[in-house]
């Protein structure tokens, strides 16, 4: 039985943000929807687009919050409460400044590292930080004052290509995660570099 019951892809809603670095988490859930042939549907009570799928014989729920990033925990908290999903059964996919494009890593727990989507998710899960994170590397602009503009802009074609390769590998690892467990998926993904 899979340890993960809910996979969340963080991003900002609307066409304006669709191709920006901050939406890397959403990109992966959309990729999984295409790969495993499920449709995400708007569900107002969960403040997001949701789906239920059976992958590798395991039932899992997917969520893309339709709130802005800094309020995305509202969606995670609402769905987790409704379906009685514990923080330890949640995987949140998000963009990661501290990893280069072409790298993605899974970890459990930790702080929010300044990421407002993680910050709100932690707050909405009663300050429980013990959920899993799948961090999609987007690189860092080099100066903390440039971070906000950087995450809300599109990656260069070279960076996007590297990010896409990491997303493809991460999508393959999600199937491993659901069939064979998080340790096996983590070992494979954390050793990958595009």
From Swiss-Prot:
An example GO biological process term is: protein quality control for misfolded or incompletely synthesized proteins
**Does RNA-binding count among this protein's keywords?**
yes
* EC number, UniProt record: 3.1.1.29
Q: Does the keyword Kinase apply?
A: no
**Where is the protein found, in the record's own terms?**
Cytoplasm
Give the top-rank taxon of the lineage listed in the UniProt record for this protein.
Answer: Bacteria
User: Binding of tRNA: at which residues?
Assistant: 17, 68, 70, 116
Listed PROSITE patterns: PEPT_TRNA_HYDROL_1, PEPT_TRNA_HYDROL_2
Report the principal subcellular site. Answer: cytoplasm
Q: Give site residues, Discriminates between blocked and unblocked aminoacyl-tRNA.
A: 12
Catalytic residues (UniProt): 22
Under Pfam families, the record lists: Pept_tRNA_hydro
Write out the catalysed reaction: an N-acyl-L-alpha-aminoacyl-tRNA + H2O = an N-acyl-L-amino acid + a tRNA + H(+)
Q: Name one GO cellular component term.
A: cytoplasm
What SUPFAM superfamilies does this protein's entry cite?
A: Peptidyl-tRNA hydrolase-like
Classification via PANTHER family: PEPTIDYL-TRNA HYDROLASE
Its quaternary structure? Answer: Monomer.
Q: What's the stated role of this polypeptide?
A: Hydrolyzes ribosome-free peptidyl-tRNAs (with 1 or more amino acids incorporated), which drop off the ribosome during protein synthesis, or as a result of ribosome stalling. Catalyzes the release of premature peptidyl moieties from peptidyl-tRNA molecules trapped in stalled 50S ribosomal subunits, and thus maintains levels of free tRNAs and 50S ribosomes.
Q: What is this protein called?
A: Peptidyl-tRNA hydrolase
The organism's taxonomy opens as: Bacteria, Pseudomonadati, Pseudomonadota, Gammaproteobacteria, Pasteurellales
State the encoding gene: pth
């Amino acid at each position: 039985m899979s340890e993960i019951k809910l996979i969340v892809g963080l991003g900002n809603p609307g066409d304006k943000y669709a191709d920006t670095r901050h939406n890397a988490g959403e990109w992966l859930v959309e990729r999984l929807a295409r790969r495993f042939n499920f449709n995400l549907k708007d569900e107002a009570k969960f403040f997001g687009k949701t789906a239920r799928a059976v992958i590798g014989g395991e039932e899992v729920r997917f969520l893309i919050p339709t709130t802005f990033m800094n309020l995305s925990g509202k969606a995670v908290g609402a769905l987790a409460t409704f379906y009685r999903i514990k923080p330890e059964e949640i995987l949140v996919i998000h963009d990661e400044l501290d990893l280069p494009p072409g790298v993605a890593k899974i970890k459990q727990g930790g702080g929010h590292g300044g990421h407002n989507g993680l910050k709100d998710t932690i707050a909405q899960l009663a300050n429980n930080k013990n959920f899993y994170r799948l961090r999609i590397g987007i690189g860092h602009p080099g100066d903390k004052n440039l971070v906000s503009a950087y995450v809300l802009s599109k990656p260069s074609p070279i960076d996007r290509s590297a990010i896409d390769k990491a997303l493809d590998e991460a999508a393959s690892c999600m199937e491993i995660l659901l069939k064979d467990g998080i340790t096996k998926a983590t070992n494979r993904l954390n050793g990958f570099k595009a």
